[in-house]
A protein has these predicted regions:
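Core of compact, soluble alpha-helical bundle domains
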Residues: 1-125
């Protein structure tokens, strides 16, 4: 069986931890105000959807697709103004979340590149 990013990260528990740390950072940092502003007050739904999406995106169970169908990331994010600032704030939070989890440096490097490519694709401004 393939050694996916999902497995290398530590599976379901670690993906959930990454998502929770990401949103905790986004919710508490003073330098991510613009990113936080495009989210609902209650982040529960966002946490669940990102967890389900990342599970499949990282090579684990395709939870998001099973529940909602194809992610259509860009289309689903089109109602929100996403520019370089929001992309960079998103990357700051995911990068810090990975560092806080003490993930293997090589895996962080690989994930950072993949996250950046996706985050940059989401820009619509």
């Amino acid at each position: 069986m393939e050694n996916t990013h999902y497995k290398r990260l530590g599976g379901e528990k670690s993906v959930r931890e990454l998502v929770d740390r990401f949103y905790d950072l986004m919710d508490s940092r003073s330098d991510t105000h613009e990113l936080r502003a495009i989210h609902a007050v209650d982040l529960s739904d966002a946490r669940d959807k990102l967890f389900m999406f990342l599970s499949g995106w990282l090579g684990g169970p395709s939870l998001y697709i099973e529940k909602f169908g194809h992610p259509r990331l860009r289309q689903r994010h089109m109602p929100f103004s996403i520019g370089e600032l929001e992309r960079d704030q998103w990357m700051t939070c995911i990068s810090q979340a990975m560092q806080d989890m003490h993930i293997d440096k090589e895996l962080i490097k690989e994930l950072y590149a993949a996250f950046y490519k996706t985050a940059d694709f989401m820009r619509n401004q």
